[in-house]
Amino acid sequence: MSSALDEDTQQTIAAGRETAGAMLRAAQKDLQKVFIVFLVGFLGTFYALRLYVWEFFRGVTKAQMDASVSGNVSIIAQTPFDVILLQAKIGLVVGVLFALPPFIYVSRGALKARDAWPKSPVAPWKLALIGLTMVALFAAGVAYGYFVFFPFTFAFLAQNAISAGFTPSYSIVKWAQFIFLLTLSFGLASQLPLAMTGLSYAEVVPYELFRDKWRHAIVGIFAFGALFTPPDPFTQIMWAVPVILLYAFSLYLARVVVTAKRGSEKIDVKSTATTHWNLLAGVGVVVGLLVYAFYEYGGVELANDGLAAIGSDYVFLAPGSGVALGAFVVAGGFVGLAFGLAYLVYRDIERLERTEIGVGDPTKLDLSALDVAGVRAAPPEAFADLEEDEVMALASAAIDDGDKAKAQALIDRFDEAEADREAEAADAEDEPGELEDRTTRAGGAFVSELTEGETDEDDIGGYYTDIAFIVDSLTSRAFWVVGWFMLVLATTFGWLYTGGIRDVYDDFLGRLPAAVRPEEVLNVVALHPMEALIFEVKFSTILAVLATLPLVAYFVWPALRERNIIRKRRRTVFVWTGALAGGLLGGFALGYTYVAPTVITFLVEDALAANMIITYRITNFFWLIFFTTAGIGLLADVPILMVLLNTAGISYRMMRNRWREVTVFILAISAVFTPASITTMFMVTLPLMAAYGVGLGVLFVLTVGGRRDLSPARGAAE
């Protein structure tokens, strides 16, 4: 193993081992104390979960549910050890986190001896302030999750499952993982103000980058939220909107901090406060009086009535004494004073920023304030980012003022800047970029090594050329392909989401014998809060892929003909689509009418004979229905597709010789679109390969053992 690592890597690993050993030796006499801290964290977490946390989580889960929904929601343990093992795992993680700081502290001597102890020029109190800020922001994000997001999300998910005819019986493991994952996501997202401000202040990431790339940030926020939240728009918006607002606040805060840093010598907070002391005092008094009026003149009652109107259980409490009321008033006055001072300082910062921009940034030059000579003498950067409509507006304003020479000068300077931009763009197109050039060389070298400099049509070089040509021909039509895919996906998901899955469920149960239909005999449950929605997304994706394949075939058909892969004309796509759709629908009708009900009935009756309580997961139940309905149609389509491919020029011998590649491809597709189980993957792959074998048998008969294909093979003379 060591021979596989270079010398530098081996030295780094050895140094790490020595450092870890030195830390353990240095902390050896204090390991008992570290273990006690670990034990406190472990046992404290274990019993806190048992006595308080699970009940708190259950309360958060059902906070916004009405009585009918709440009565159907239950948290279950699938195995006897689920609860205790989950508590132990969480306790271990918390215990390690508790023990890590004291372990590092007691081993600091070894780290200092190896010069691995950080030497920060930042004062300890500043580090403590940053740490407290991080904790406060994390707590604020978690509070939003527990008191706003989770109650509405769980109520929505439970109602969605019940309306579809399922029972929300959440596994405690999956339920806890869902809560902890979203808790972590809210906690991390709440660090945006500190992260953006710190990066901008340290100039690691310029503030201008955060400001200019805000559209990319919004897309990233929604993408990040899609990984953690349910796939419905409501909960994604509830997650993304607060984070977007937090990004805007962070951007504002970063601007203040960066501008203050750049002009720190020209801003005097004390002088600003002294100059405007009367204004600050007035703001503090007004805010204090508003707090007093809120508590003394019906503000508490109005606020509580508003909270009750939106279904919230939270209430404002009136202070218990005059002393407490006075403290609230004084605190409100100081808060108003702080905000007033912050506003005045920010106003000074903005004035300074405008002054600096006006002096040093030619792109911010105000062209409307210049005369003819000023326009002609302005730097080219002042016109570089202007649009034509902006220049015409400036020229029109100059004409309205009677200055036609200035209007003509503006247009002339804009034309010059436009010509420079076009010349730069032409030069950029003529010279390939460094990354593109490297990619081309790397791809060419890779294919050349595999093909030994020759690109025969039947080796990997020939396949690479074919695939690259086909993909390139499809790129120009990618908008139509993606648009059609998304349309089918959204339509199917919307139908399932708005009650379609319940209609399918009820119709299918109506085809089962009466003995296996009562709820006490056959029950379908959701073990994960998002299980029903995830199944709807996967099923919609499969249908969208099937609906998009004919469109893809239509667009790539000319490229396939040009590469001599197929020989039929493009109108053949319609024949193919009709034949495959007929096979799919015929197999689906057969499976939905006879195969699926027979299989479900057999399984249920077998379980009833053993006196078992039958409870199926949503995913397992509906994937079973899918495989025994649409799966029959897909199996029927395999021989049909093979015959069609043979008529298009794919020879019988090629299909027979390439069965290994087909097997690997089907395994990969099964791994993506079926439940995460090796057994299920093989249960899908084996029938499809059996159908592939049937197709080979049919082609063997039709082509007389491969001697007479239904169409000339690829590469044959026309």
Curated annotation (Swiss-Prot):
Stretches that traverse the bilayer: 34-54, 84-104, 137-157, 178-198, 214-231, 234-254, 280-300, 325-345, 478-498, 539-559, 572-592, 621-641, 661-681, 682-702
Renumbered to this chain, region (Disordered) spans 421-451
* A single GO BP: intracellular protein transmembrane transport
- Membership in a protein family: Belongs to the TatC family.
- Which residues lie in Acidic residues bias regions? 425-434
Is Membrane one of the keywords?
yes
Instruction: Print the keywords alphabetically.
Output: Cell membrane, Membrane, Protein transport, Translocation, Transmembrane, Transmembrane helix, Transport
- Pfam families, per this entry? TatC
- Coarse class of the primary localization is membrane
Q: What is this protein called?
A: Sec-independent protein translocase protein TatCt
Role according to the record: Part of the twin-arginine translocation (Tat) system that transports large folded proteins containing a characteristic twin-arginine motif in their signal peptide across membranes.
Assembly and partners?
Forms a complex with TatA.
Q: Which HAMAP family match?
A: TatC
Additional remarks? H.volcanii possesses two TatC translocases: TatCo and TatCt. Both paralogs are structurally atypical and may represent adaptation to the extensive utilization of the Tat pathway in haloarchaea.
Q: State its location(s).
A: Cell membrane
Q: Which GO terms describe its cellular component?
A: TAT protein transport complex
A single GO molecular function term of this UniProt record: proton motive force dependent protein transmembrane transporter activity
Give membrane topology per the record: Multi-pass membrane protein
